[in-house]
Amino acid sequence: MTAAGAKISVQGVAKTFQSAAGDAVSALGEVDLDIAPGEFVSIVGPSGCGKSTLLNVLAGFEEPSQGEALMDGRPIRGPGPERGVVFQEYALFPWLTVAGNVAFGPASRGIAADEVAARVRHYVAMVKLDGSERKYPHELSGGMRQRCALARCIANDPDVLLMDEPLAALDALTRLSLQDELLRIWSEASRERPKTVLYITHAIDEAIYLSDRVVVMSERPGRIRRVIEVPFARPRAPEIRTDPRFHALTDEIWLLLRREP
């Protein structure tokens, strides 16, 4: 795929920060990556390799020190409603209910009240929180809070979902369950228009289970070590975790992450 056909295109992006001592710290090496419309791509790599930095560049929260990030062929210059972000920390407004959190984005963009209400009903039901609309974040379990965060994100109808370890804080069983929920929600949200996903995770099995491709990054300054195609058809079933190809991919990625730079 050429950059012209990509939903997201990362072209020679690098990022350097200044440390407290005034030294230049290279967090992200030159990265080139194209992501197709409707594709689900995960990034795995060692801690501090620049995964979240790359996501922040694509979200428009940070500018690259060199190179360029594009969406639909246009440079990304800042945040925008066409790109939704879901964080590990849920990032819900504690003073708003589930319904209030989901309504916040569309309402703040001036969408008509009846349309906002319709979106709230639709997306709250999609993430299976109907009946909890009047609850506040502190009244929800971790899994419910993350589903609310996802509903709030997709209520803005973004083309691209940028997800930074959204399931990392959950217990193992809840995490496995929400992986299936995430795939279901992504599929339902993509019915009218494909949603492109960039997903950051430390969990190799999660990356394989969710993704069309897995990007393996090196130690800091992070560069792409390899891009691995995931061979499993969609919809995904939990049984693929026992497939020998699943285990072979897990081993391949693990060995890449263990390898010295």
Protein language model regions, located:
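The feature captures the beta-strand-to-loop junction immediately N-terminal to the Walker
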Residues: 44-46
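Helix-to-loop junction immediately C-terminal to a conserved catalytic motif
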Residues: 59
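Conserved ABC transporter NBD signature motif
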Residues: 67-79
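Short helical segment in ABC ATPase nucleotide-binding domains corresponding to the A-loop/adjacent helical element
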Residues: 87, 99-107, 117, 121, ...
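Conserved ABC ATPase "signature" region
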Residues: 112-132, 184
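Conserved signature/switch motifs of ABC ATPase nucleotide-binding domains
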Residues: 135-138, 156
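Hydrophobic anchor residue at the start of the ABC signature
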Residues: 150
